[in-house]
Amino acid sequence: MNKTVIKTFQISKEYKILKKNFQLFKNKTTIISGIIPSVFLKINIIKRFIFYVNYFNLYLKILKKNSKNVIFNNFNHKNKLSSYKQLIFFLTKNKKEFKLHLTFLLSHISKTCVIYVVGEKKCGINSISKIFSNYLIFKKIDYARTCSLYKAKIMKLPKFYLHKFINIYIWNNITIQSLPGVFGYKKIDTGSKLLISTFNKKINGKILDIGSGTGILSIALAKKNPLIKITLTDIYDAAIWCSKNNLIKNNLIGKVLFSDIYSHIKKRYDLIISNPPIHYNLKINLKILKKIIKNSKKHLKKKGELRIVISSFISLKYIINFNKINFKILLKNKSYTVIQITN
């Protein structure tokens, strides 16, 4: 799972700088994409627009209010965007991730489309000109504190080749293909290794992997326990692509689906596993972790188990109700803790 959640209006510097420059783009047909501030879902400051999103949780929120004004991209559908006159793109902290998605969008729009990119300095906004120097001419048109707004003219449209963004590595005879923004993009992380190491006994039944990312947790379990039935979920389109393709690459069968934690989970499972995200960009956010724990009982069979790995700096008192939850620490090191919660 990518470490991304929707921003609130109170912390959206990007929205404030766009509102300040509203006259620049208010009357043009507009594509709004990237990490979109939640205020854009509530206030229509642009009359004719379409949201182009890569995160399922954001898609679900937009769908409730603007069902005709949203496209959810999962790399399998080519959408006609050439009629739009401008693109407003909200930057992520990951340079390779925004290069992936902005390149994809540029390959589908008109050459006359005007590009606006907005983001904070810590997200790499000031390096945007260098990253797209072969295709776009950028000019900074406004800035406020640590947030900047750039306008770009298209010199030529890039061709999008997904394979150019794929990183491949091998761990314990498991081949992993990953895309920018997917957790575990460069290599398997230490937390996932620790969680996998706790599965030293035979596992049976149905397994749910929340925030599957590359799919490494489920793949490692299925390699050791070939009779288990695995379901992998995520909110990020690139993560779903990775999970699906890595199952195939490692000769495994499983279900892979979009779900905002438990939003599209209807069955009960013998085991739920997760290495949940605890950050939004550079800030700690434990909402997802809390929801996974709190609602796990509804999706576990009798005597079922939730097994998750969390950073050791997180206080268990903050995320677990000791009076209502039966849990124990299975393994711990300086950086991570593996927790088992039984139903």
Swiss-Prot record:
- Coiled-coil ranges per the record? none
- According to its UniProt record, where is this protein located? Cytoplasm
Q: Name one GO cellular component term.
A: cytoplasm
Q: Does the keyword Transferase apply?
A: yes
User: Main location per UniProt?
Assistant: cytoplasm
Q: Which InterPro entries match?
A: Mtase_sm_N, RsmC/RlmG, SAM-dependent_MTases_sf, Small_mtfrase_dom
Q: What is its EC number?
A: 2.1.1.172
Question: Which top class of enzyme applies to this chain?
Answer: transferase
User: Annotated Gene Ontology MF terms?
Assistant: 16S rRNA (guanine(1207)-N(2))-methyltransferase activity
Q: Which Gene3D superfamilies match?
A: Vaccinia Virus protein VP39
Q: Which family does it belong to?
A: Belongs to the methyltransferase superfamily. RsmC family.
Q: Which PANTHER family match?
A: RIBOSOMAL RNA SMALL SUBUNIT METHYLTRANSFERASE C
What is the protein name for this chain?
Answer: Ribosomal RNA small subunit methyltransferase C
Q: Which organism encodes this protein?
A: Buchnera aphidicola subsp. Cinara cedri (strain Cc)
Q: Which gene encodes it?
A: rsmC
